[in-house]
Amino acid sequence: MLSPDVLKKLEAIEQRFEELTQLLSDPAVAGNGDRFRKVAKERASIEQTVTALRAYRKLLDDVAGNEALLGDKDPELRELAKEELAQLRPQVEPAEEQLKLYLVPKDPNDEKDVIVEIRAGAGGDEAGLFAAEVMRMYVRYAERRGWRVELMDTSGGALGGVKEATLTVSGDAVYSSLKYESGVHRVQRVPATEAQGRIHTSTVTVAVMPEAEEIDVQVNPADVEMDVFRSTGSGGQSVNTTDSAVRLTHKPTGIVVKCQQEKSQLKNRTMAMKMLRAKLFEIEQERQRSARDATRKSQVGTGDRSEKIRTYNFPQDRLTDHRVNYTRHNLPAVMDGDVQDVIDACRTFYAAQALREASRGDAGAAERRA
């Protein structure tokens, strides 16, 4: 059974949902576009929780009703009640666990768009080839989700691979899903260039950063040095006759970003500034996390790039996410963007972890009050 504290929190959310529903029908709110969107967004953010709570109540009512029938004089009715209970009772605990997960505090960055950096690591040309495949995997996943992808910068490698690539992904709550991709992705397979048929291990590093708005990060123009140059193709040759590519250097931190995908220097500068703000935002987020808890290890999804998070074993047609001990097969589908189940496994695991931490915090607060 859910504890009284958990039920109280869920009922408060339901009450807020009802208040927001009434506000949406208020002419004063309906006539104010900004207010209406804000109210509608908040209501949508808790609607799933309320729906689950009401379904849970109905489930408990159904269980109680059938338990009452177990004492009925009619043996046929008692048998039907037993059959119903055999189906209903196993649903109670999973429903309760799901409701608890809805109470996990939301990451304030979850609704943000993201910047994804993909870099070939150890493994030479094979790492570059896999980096290109990982990039395509995210593009295909974004297409499945109805998100928009823009290539901001790329550095070509041999055999059609990439040394590094930077993408922006925009859409509905992009960071809430892609944040679990930060880290080292390891591939085990026989490279196309391997004549002896030996299995090689290569790595690709992925960094996912929430896109920062100007309100999130203030950048002093005097701290930014801008260089312009001609865009280059994958082989290094110039592909533009004007200096449209832009390189920005943030002098206080030494961060360097560049963008050369657009023909317009202004557009490249705008996109480069977007990348710079995201990197500075990430630094500030990391500083705050470290200040809150230097020993906390729930870094996944918030950017620990040195962590080996996943292995793609092609000879065994197997993907393993080492953080959550999740395994699945059919790598061709994975590389074509079919990764929602992996992301869901990560989300469930870390939400449960956050809930345990929050519960320990609540227990500690209760002890202090006592």
From Swiss-Prot:
Q: Which UniProt keywords apply?
A: Cytoplasm, Methylation, Protein biosynthesis
Report the GO terms under cellular component: cytoplasm
Q: Which residues form a coiled coil?
A: none
| InterPro entries named in the record | PCRF, Pep_chain_release_fac_I, Pep_chain_release_fac_I_sf, Prokaryotic/Mito_RF, RF-1
Which branch of life, at top level?
Answer: Bacteria
Location in the cell reads: Cytoplasm
The known PTMs are summarized as:
Methylated by PrmC. Methylation increases the termination efficiency of RF1.
Q: What is this protein called?
A: Peptide chain release factor 1
Q: Which organism is it from?
A: Anaeromyxobacter dehalogenans (strain 2CP-C)
Lineage of the organism: Bacteria, Pseudomonadati, Myxococcota, Myxococcia, Myxococcales
